[in-house]
Amino acid sequence: MSEAAVEKIEGYVASVLQSMDVELVDIQFRCEGHGWVLRLFIDVEGGVTLDLCAQVSREVGQYLDVEDVIEQAYHLEVSSPGVERPLKSLANFERFAGKKARIKLHEPLNGEKTFEGIIGPVEDGEVSLLVDGKIAVKCGIEQLNKARLVL
């Protein structure tokens, strides 16, 4: 599927979910053992329920069927991101301040790319990660390669 098709799907899904007060955490489209899978990871205050996943699946599935955005056969899966959910926005870091996270930077900082610690405050558009009570990393979201909560 083209990048434009993925962006079109992501834009539609995000607008539908926003009207439902649901966050689109991540979207994946990949070929797996049983064929192509479009996987949506959603989150909501209070947690994701099976009924919510089914509702999102119906709404998104109807749109994809009508618009015929995906050329090949695929399966649509909707689920929660799990306890080790990705952190992709400043709002995510604000929401989960005080929780344990692992971040990986695009470029090394003091010779290290990967850090694990407690999410600190978001200030001036920068996220911070505390290790042993001190700020170990303070950077813009664009400097992060990956970030996720950890147990």
UniProtKB/Swiss-Prot annotation:
Pfam families: DUF150_C, RimP_N. GO terms for cellular component: cytosol. One of its GO terms (biological process) is translation. The keyword Cytoplasm applies. It is found in: Cytoplasm. Coiled coil: none annotated. Keywords: Cytoplasm, Ribosome biogenesis. The keyword Cytoplasm applies. Its main location: cytoplasm. InterPro entries: Ribosome_maturation_RimP, RimP_C, RimP_C_sf, RimP_N, RimP_N_sf. Belongs to the RimP family. Required for maturation of 30S ribosomal subunits. This is Ribosome maturation factor RimP.
